[in-house]
From Swiss-Prot:
Subcellular location: Cytoplasm
Organism: Schizosaccharomyces pombe (strain 972 / ATCC 24843) (Fission yeast)
Gene: dtd1
Domain notes: A Gly-cisPro motif from one monomer fits into the active site of the other monomer to allow specific chiral rejection of L-amino acids.
Family: Belongs to the DTD family.
Subunit structure: Homodimer.
Descriptive protein name: D-aminoacyl-tRNA deacylase
Pfam families: Tyr_Deacylase (PF02580)
Role: An aminoacyl-tRNA editing enzyme that deacylates mischarged D-aminoacyl-tRNAs. Also deacylates mischarged glycyl-tRNA(Ala), protecting cells against glycine mischarging by AlaRS. Acts via tRNA-based rather than protein-based catalysis; rejects L-amino acids rather than detecting D-amino acids in the active site. By recycling D-aminoacyl-tRNA to D-amino acids and free tRNA molecules, this enzyme counteracts the toxicity associated with the formation of D-aminoacyl-tRNA entities in vivo and helps enforce protein L-homochirality.
Length: 149
């Protein structure tokens, strides 16, 4: 699994010009499910997201987790994270998991995060839809994480 984890002041996702989800301070996560991902990757990614200290506390930077600040998460599926562009100009998506299997793992990540933070703290995009994602990146702080590395 690959994730782009962005610390945001706010973020939203729209489909057909209608906002379907929005959050305030927290993370906007673009999540790509790879063809070789398993439930173990769900656990590894979820644990990493929950343990990351990307927020400041009163005394020092990089000391607080998403739970510490009572932040929210907007999790958006993005199969293009596994695209290869080494040969030619057209992206190769063969390393991305197919929709029916990928949605199960994506939903497991959302569920796992919700169980830890509270389901009201987790919002998501529409799996497989063409979406517009808007965000105010705070810092900017953007972390790339791959469960296979």
């Amino acid at each position: 699994m690959k994730a782009v984890i962005q610390r945001v002041l706010n973020a939203s996702v729209s489909v057909d010009d209608k906002i379907v989800s929005a959050i305030q301070q927290g993370y906007c996560i673009l999540l790509g499910v790879g063809s070789d991902d398993t439930p173990e990757d769900v656990t590894k990614l979820s644990n990493k997201i929950l343990k990351l200290k990307l927020f400041d506390n009163a005394e020092q930077p990089w000391k607080s987790t998403i739970a510490d600040i009572q932040g929210e998460i907007l999790c958006v599926s993005q199969f293009t994270l596994h695209a290869r562009v080494n040969k030619g100009a057209k992206p190769d998506f063969h390393r991305s998991m197919k929709g029916p299997e990928a949605i199960e793992l994506y939903e497991q990540v959302v569920k796992t995060l919700g169980e830890s933070l509270g389901s009201d703290k987790i919002k998501k995009g529409v799996f497989g839809a063409m979406m517009n994602v808007q965000l105010v990146n705070n810092g900017p702080v953007t972390i790339l994480y791959d469960t296979k590395e």
